[in-house]
A protein has these predicted regions:
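Conserved radical SAM core fold
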Residues: 36, 81-83, 107-112, 124, ...
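C-terminal accessory region of radical SAM enzymes
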Residues: 217-245, 272-323
Length: 368
C-alpha cells in the first residue's frame, strides 16, 4: 500500500514523495545508463554512452527476485528509459506480473505508437521532467533548447492517453520564478496530479554544477509562494527540501525505496548511494549496497538490514538539546553525506534551528 511521506507537520526532507506501508517495498530500476540529453543536475551523469540492462536479465532475474522481495510498485528510470530498445517488452512483462508501473522520462523519445500501447496495458503512469518552462531555461539546463517544445507536446499526448501522473522539476539559476506559475498552469491544464520540485543537489553531475546553477534560498521561497495557490485548484504541490523555518524534519525510509543499477547492484536507497559516490563522501558506496540482483536473491539481505540499528541519526549535541528532538526525523542521511558529513550530524540544509557554532563533533560512525 502506498504511503505518503509528505505531511503538514514535518518538513519534506526526503527526496521521495511516497513510500510503501507494511513490509512491502518500492523499486526503481535503471534499465539504461544512456540518455539523449545532458542535464546539468543528473544524479547518474547520463549521456549518449553507457549500457542497457539486458531484457533477459530483467525478465529472468530482476523482476522475479524483486517480486520475492515483496516489491509492490515499480518505476523504470535511466538515463532515459525510452531509449532502451526493449522498453515496450519490459512494460508488458511488468503489467503481466500485476505491478503498477511508473516511468520517469524527459518526454522526447516516446512515439505515438508507444503511448497507445502503454495506455492499452493499463495501470501505467508517467512522470515528466520540466526544469523550468521556457526553452531558454529548461532546454539549456538539459543541453538541448529544442527539447522543450517536444517535451511539452509529448506531455500533452501522455495526458490525452490517461497516462500522465506528475511533473518533476529542479528549480535552478536559469529559471525565473514566474516559470513555476506557468508550469503549474500547464499541470492543471493537462490534468497532472502533482508537481514535485526539489533543489539541485550535490549528486552526480550536480557536484560540479550546484555552486553555479542551484537556485538560492530566496528564489526557492519565492517559488513556493507563487505555486501554493494552485492547491485550491486541485494540484498537489510537493516542495522537497525547500527552505524550512519552523518544522521538525522528516525521517529516512531506507530499505523501503530500493534501486537497481544497470549492472545489477542493488541500492538500499538510490540517493544515499549517489551521495556515497561523490568525492566529498566519507563512506564507500558498498556500505549502502545490498549485493547484486543478477547474482543472488535480495529479499533476505534487505530483510536483515536495519539502518537505524547501524547508525544513530541526530547523534550530536544540537539535536540532543533541541526542543523538537522527540518529533524530528533528523532529515536525509544522503544529503548529509553529499555535503561531506557523517550520518548523525545535523541536516543543515533543512534544520530550522539557527546554528551559531562551527561544525559539530561527529558522534555516529560507520558500523563495522
Amino acid at each position: 500500500m502506498r504511503r505518503s511521506l509528505i505531511v503538514d507537520t514535518h518538513a519534506s526532507s526526503c527526496y521521495f514523495r511516497t513510500s510503501i506501508g507494511g513490509d512491502g517495498r518500492k523499486a526503481l530500476i535503471q534499465i539504461t545508463e544512456r540518455c539523449n540529453l545532458h542535464c546539468a543536475h543528473c544524479f547518474v551523469s547520463s549521456g549518449d554512452w553507457g549500457d542497457h540492462m539486458r531484457f533477459e536479465d530483467i525478465v529472468e532475474r530482476v523482476l522475479p527476485r524483486l517480486k520475492r522481495a515483496r516489491v509492490e510498485r515499480l518505476t523504470l528510470t535511466g538515463g532515459e528509459p525510452f531509449v532502451h530498445p526493449a522498453i515496450m517488452e519490459i512494460c508488458a512483462v511488468v503489467a503481466d506480473m500485476g505491478w503498477p508501473l511508473g516511468i520517469c522520462t524527459n518526454a522526447t523519445q516516446t512515439t505515438d505508437e508507444q503511448i497507445g500501447r502503454l495506455a492499452a496495458l493499463g495501470n501505467v503512469h508517467i512522470n515528466v521532467s520540466f526544469d523550468g518552462f521556457r526553452a531558454e531555461s529548461h532546454g539549456k539546463f538539459r543541453g538541448n533548447q529544442a527539447s522543450f517544445a517536444t517535451t511539452v507536446a509529448t506531455t500533452r499526448k501522455f495526458a490525452e492517453a490517461g497516462l500522465l501522473q506528475g511533473l518533476l522539476s529542479t528549480p535552478n539559476a536559469l529559471t525565473e520564478v514566474e516559470e513555476f506559475t506557468a508550469l503549474c498552469e500547464f499541470a492543471v491544464e493537462v490534468g497532472a496530479e502533482y508537481v514535485l520540485m526539489n533543489p539541485l543537489s550535490s549528486f552526480g553531475r550536480g557536484v560540479k554544477s550546484q555552486s553555479r546553477l542551484a537556485a538560492d534560498a530566496d528564489k526557492m521561497r519565492a517559488i513556493r509562494a507563487v505555486t501554493e495557490r494552485f492547491r485550491e485548484r486541485g494540484l498537489d504541490l510537493v516542495h522537497i527540501r525547500f527552505p524550512n523555518d519552523e518544522l521538525p524534519l522528516g525521517g529516512c525510509d531506507i530499505g523501503k525505496l530500493i534501486y537497481v543499477f544497470v549492472n545489477g547492484q542493488l541500492a538500499l536507497c538510490p540517493y544515499i548511494v549517489f551521495a556515497a559516490r561523490t568525492p566529498q563522501s566519507k563512506y564507500p558506496d558498498t556500505e549502502f549496497l545490498a549485493g547484486n540482483i543478477f547474482e543472488d536473491e535480495v529479499g533476505p539481505t534487505l530483510d536483515a538490514y536495519d539502518f537505524h540499528s547501524r547508525y544513530t541519526v541526530g547523534a550530536n549535541m544540537k539535536c540532543g538539546s533541541c526542543r523538537m528532538n522527540g518529533a524530528c526525523g533528523k532529515g536525509c542521511p544522503a544529503a548529509i553525506i553529499a555535503n561531506g558529513g557523517y550520518i548523525g550530524e545535523v541536516d543543515r540544509e533543512q534544520c530550522p534551528v539557527p546554528d551559531g557554532s562551527k561544525r559539530l563533533l561527529q558522534i555516529g560512525q560507520p558500523a563495522a
